[in-house]
């Protein structure tokens, strides 16, 4: 049963889709999406690989039950089929001829020479030292100005640990250049690591992927309001009119204009700010203080992005190239210290006879005939300025009946997106069945 209030939902990532799914049960909604597909970072690409049809995700790929409780509950409500995934991490440093993975002892010492390398062995000891010290840090008072760089200096860990373990792993997780990771507030960084079981060698969570690709859940969510979705329809402006009548929020988009009582913006914070006509100082201070990093995502079949030593292959591979590796093709002008590849066969249980990879900002040349798809994604950079902006998000929620949701409000992951949507829904007196 719906009332006559009209609500606009802008964007179709997990935050917007969650909002629209539950708002549709109470209000008359309209969802705007500027792209020609729904899902935002949930982007499944259907490819033909030597005659075999394969669905591959290039954005959202995996989740677990412990640290994604709302996503787990939503998938169960939607009856989404999931499959176990295998999460592991590897590092490939070309200038040092260094390759290793954290899967097991055999992969840690994939290069047997590292058994006799003091710096590498110290790195392993530093991992244990960091894990213990990081847990202690969480018991101290919060200081957003205490950065990861300062924390690592205080721990006196070796360069191998910082440059070839911790910062590459974090860079891969947050899709952020290595040189910017050190600016992250240490406690926020460590809290994420602890919540995801990254401060312990044992007790790792079981990871899952959506069977058939993330498009399965996107399609299921949209079933009940497919006639209320406007694709290829970018919102140009959102203006709050001075009249006190109902539907006093005017939206101008690619396809025309419409009027609403409430608006939920699930776009990135910088995009949301640009949409607002005459934003308040509060909007500027909160939405304007989160920066974003452009990253090129390439879906391809070139196994050269993986370690040369097969023992060091893992689901996520961070690669650091030397300067001579920078190619002169479309991959130039990308973050100098961020190149990550995902082994999709391992992550999404794809037939190993069809090697398939997703690479973020690859520096080496990938033959055009090996590329299936490529796309630019933007990821938030969680420096101290962003963390402070996050803490003030509630100050702008509901101002002039405009609300904001998005994974940028926390750590940038799917659980953060859905959680932000639930906070907005709760403010509108709507609760999910599992709440």
Residue ranges and their predicted role:
Residues 234-378:
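Mid-domain catalytic core of redox enzymes
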Residues 45-71:
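N-terminal glycine-rich dinucleotide-binding loop that anchors FAD/FMN and/or NAD(P) in oxidoreductases
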